[in-house]
Amino acid sequence: HLTDIHIGGGFLSKEVDEKAINAVATMITKEKPDLVIATGDIAFPVPYMAGTFNNYSGAKAFGNLMESLGVYWTVTFGNHDAECYSYFDREAVAEIYSDEEFKHCLFQAGPEDVDGYGNHVIEVKNTDGIITQAIVLIDSQAYVKNNLIESIKGTYDNIHPNQVEWYENEIKRMNSENNKTIKAIQGDVNGGLHKDFATVKSL
């Protein structure tokens, strides 16, 4: 699990971007995870710190990095991934991560009739194709109103009712397909994975 990588993608952030990318690459190379989930603020196109409004470059740089490492990955968005002044909105950023060139990316933009971008489920299956657990990713939006004043004030949005309804329906769907209740992934106090998750051999 990664968060707040803050790749500025501009001339002012070149040095710190390289440090962030190298840190991620080192961590993943050492840990060798089966799946990496980045939960927001992958890009950080804040002009006075990055020197650009271009949030495409940060998103693209992260995608290229993950593909070069050959690990499965996905993302959810933070407030900085598509600021009101950024060149690309959340829908456009979702299209970047949905690009077929990212072969290891499990990201999905999600249903059009559900608020937000990136609402999706990753089903963890055993070798018999049975869903043993599920990872549900939900877009918690950015700001209540997508404008500069709200972003400065930090008036953050949240998960909307139709997203909760979507989540409930997805859980019901998977339970119905399996004819059993899907367990949530739980970590123990020592940071290890739940014993049931450790037995899963494939996605």
Describe these PLM feature segments.
Residues 2-3, 36-41, 73-79, 184-187, ...:
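Active-site neighborhood of phospho(di)ester-bond hydrolases with catalytic His/Asp-centered motifs
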Residues 57-182, 192-200:
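Extended active-site neighborhood of metal-dependent phosphoesterases/phosphodiesterases
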Residues 1-56, 61:
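N-terminal active-site segment of His-dependent metallophosphoesterases
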